[in-house]
C-alpha cells in the first residue's frame, strides 16, 4: 500500500517541450523555492513553457520559469516571478548532464512540475531539438493513428 509521502500530484505539464524536442532521457530534481513560491505552486500558478535548465559552477539552475506572485501576500514579501532557481540533484547526475550537454549539443528542458509527498519536484528532459520535417512527421503519424482507431471503431 502506498504511503502518504509517495503520492504524486502533477501541478503543470510542459506539453510543448515534447513537440519541440526529442526527449532522450529524463531526470528528477528537487527545486529550491521560497515560501510564497510554494504557495503559488500549490495554487497551480506555474508556467514551464519558456523555461530551460543550465549547469553553472557545478550546479543545475532552472531559468525563465514563471511562478506567479502569491496573491494573499504583500508586495514586500513576494518573490520575483522569473528568478533563477537552484535544482537539487546529486553531483553524479549533474556531471553526467554536463558531459552529455557539452559533447552532444543537447538541451535540458523542464517537462513537468509535481508534488511528491510534500516536496516540489521537477522532471527535466535531455533532448535534441526537432527540425520542421520531424514535427510534420510526428503530426502525420498521430493523425494516421487517429484515423486507424476511428476505422477500427466502426
UniProtKB/Swiss-Prot annotation:
Residues 135-154 are annotated as: Disordered. The keyword Cytoplasm applies. It is found in: Cytoplasm. GO terms for molecular function: RNA binding. Its main location: cytoplasm. Keywords: Cytoplasm, RNA-binding. CDD domains: SmpB. InterPro entries: SmpB, SsrA-bd_prot, SsrA-bd_prot_CS. PROSITE patterns: SSRP (PS01317). NCBIfam families: PRK05422.1, smpB. Belongs to the SmpB family. This is SsrA-binding protein. It comes from Microcystis aeruginosa (strain NIES-843 / IAM M-2473). The gene is smpB.
Amino acid at each position: 500500500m502506498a504511503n502518504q509521502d509517495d503520492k504524486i500530484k502533477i501541478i503543470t505539464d510542459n506539453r510543448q517541450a515534447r513537440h519541440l524536442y526529442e526527449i532522450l532521457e529524463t531526470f528528477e530534481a528537487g527545486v529550491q523555492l521560497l515560501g510564497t513560491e510554494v504557495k503559488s505552486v500549490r495554487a497551480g500558478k506555474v508556467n514551464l513553457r519558456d523555461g530551460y535548465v543550465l549547469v553553472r559552477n557545478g550546479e543545475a539552475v532552472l531559468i525563465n520559469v514563471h511562478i506567479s506572485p502569491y496573491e494573499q501576500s504583500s508586495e514586500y514579501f513576494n518573490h520575483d516571478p522569473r528568478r533563477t532557481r537552484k535544482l537539487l540533484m546529486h553531483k553524479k547526475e549533474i556531471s553526467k548532464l554536463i558531459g552529455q550537454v557539452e559533447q552532444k549539443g543537447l538541451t535540458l528542458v523542464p517537462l513537468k512540475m509535481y508534488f511528491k509527498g510534500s516536496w516540489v519536484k521537477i522532471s527535466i528532459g535531455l533532448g535534441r531539438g526537432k527540425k520542421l520535417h520531424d514535427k510534420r512527421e510526428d503530426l502525420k503519424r498521430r493523425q494516421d493513428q487517429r484515423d486507424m482507431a476511428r476505422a477500427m471503431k466502426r
